[in-house]
Amino acid sequence: MKKHLFLLLLCVAWISAQAGTNIQLFYDFGSLNTACQNERSNRITTTIELFYPDKWGSTFAFIDLDYAIHPNDPKNTIFLGYTEIARCLNFWHESPAKDLSIQVEYNGGLGLGRANTGGLIGYGISHAGLIGLNYCLHTKDYKNIFNLELLYKYIADGDNKLKNKVPLQFTFVWGCDDFCTAPGLRFCGFLDIWGQRGPDKQSWVMLTEPQLWYNVGRWFKCPNLHVGTEIEVSYNFTGSGVMVNPCLGIKWNFD
């Protein structure tokens, strides 16, 4: 567990050192579904995010770190870390297919939970490898982006509890500056849909996290600073049915 945590922190350090990086800090108010309220309320999440285009394609990565401040969580610790790293390969920028790339991706994480004895136990979170096609339309500065992905998804699960007959994932990513012609307002987010076998039956999973940010720093010569909100909407993600988790946050852009 310590080795895995060390590798995760190395990833954090690498992402933070890159251009095109931002860091977000969210307070999670918990699920609007009262049956799930105690599972997600009163938690703080740090997200470190990177997007870096180059002449061979682009690299995207993020790391989520959840901090324990809820009475049911392990005390004084980062109790969950989750990361995604995706690389798009494109060697045909001058061809008619310039907006289409080959994408390879890794998803996974580590968590801490309480055992029946009251102690802490570590566990892995859906380690998965993905490969497929990425279609991306964007402005020259990538401030406005429209991105569709169709990926084959392999979930590493020795017990075959999560395997699906059609192991595909569909992803839609968007970003829009000056949303609704409002200067400094940015609307962005993603939508993931994939198939996954649940504990009892086949099911499909949906996760979307739309964000709305306002560049408050533009009013006092600090354009890196943003405040905003994120709403996590999921279906069959961490439990059965629909969950809606509103958050408030601040963001700092390093570029």
Cite the ranges covered by each PLM segment.
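Sec-dependent N-terminal signal peptides
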Residues: 4-13
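Residues on the lipid-exposed face of transmembrane beta-strands in outer-membrane beta-barrel proteins
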Residues: 48-52, 83-91, 131-137, 150-152, ...
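Outer-membrane beta-barrel transmembrane domain signature
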Residues: 153-224, 252-254
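Short glycine/proline- and aromatic-enriched beta-strand/turn motifs that initiate or cap beta-hairpins
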Residues: 18-66
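Short loop/turn motifs that connect adjacent beta-strands in outer-membrane beta-barrel proteins
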Residues: 18-20, 56-60, 90-101, 138-147, ...
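Surface-exposed loop and membrane-interface regions of Gram-negative outer-membrane beta-barrel proteins
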Residues: 62-123, 205
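Residues that define the transmembrane beta-barrel architecture of outer-membrane proteins
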Residues: 42-46, 77-83, 123-131, 162-170, ...
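Transmembrane beta-strands of outer-membrane beta-barrel pores
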Residues: 27-31, 54, 65-69, 104-112, ...
